[in-house]
A protein has these predicted regions:
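C-terminal accessory/tail domains of diverse enzymes
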Residues: 1-181
């Protein structure tokens, strides 16, 4: 939630897949199991398969695909050329108030894409956060710890990101209004 807007949750403009329905993570695991293993060059997967497998899972609570956190409407829809632009909309990212903050976000996303291209993320199971999702990640401490883990993993993979580059993001998302002595 470090880069999200102020409005989050199942009725927001970009809900996470696991914020609305309890069974969505299980269904997503089933969908992911239909893709060939990473690095399996022997199995060709048509680009439109991603759209067909994930379209009804990456939705908001009303079934709207355009309001999901990850919107694949323009990735590779078999229904027409306007849906075959190769675009993945990451709708949960709020436009930061400064261009340099935007550049830091873009650098982070490029590093993550490059890292996952080399070594796809393939956990045995997805995490079922339940209500702990908002209980934890609305607090700056847990967001900071989670972000530090991401930056550490990227650095270990050879991407020289620095956590300090994102200090303005933390100040913006979690402003300090006072201190108790």
């Amino acid at each position: 939630y470090l880069f999200s807007g102020l409005f989050i949750g199942p009725t927001s403009q970009s809900p996470r897949v696991d914020e609305a329905r309890n069974d969505s993570v299980y269904e997503l695991e089933i969908a992911f199991s239909q893709f060939p293993p990473a690095g399996d060059a022997d199995r060709y997967v048509a680009p439109w398969i991603i759209d067909r497998v994930l379209r009804n899972l990456l939705i908001d609570s009303t079934g709207n695909t355009h309001r999901a956190e990850f919107c694949i409407d323009k990735l590779y829809s078999p229904e027409g050329t306007s849906g075959r632009l190769g675009l993945l909309e990451m709708r949960a990212f709020e436009m930061p108030p400064h261009a340099q903050m935007s550049l830091a976000q873009q650098l982070l996303l490029r590093a993550l894409i490059a890292r996952f291209w080399r070594k796809p993320y393939a956990p045995e199971r997805l995490v079922r956060w339940g209500t702990e999702l908002h209980d934890r990640f609305m607090l700056p401490y847990f967001v900071q710890q989670d972000f530090e883990d991401v930056v550490s993993e990227l650095r270990a993979a050879g991407y020289p990101l620095e956590s300090a580059w994102f200090a303005p993001h933390f100040e913006f998302r979690f402003p300090v209004h006072g201190r108790i002595a």
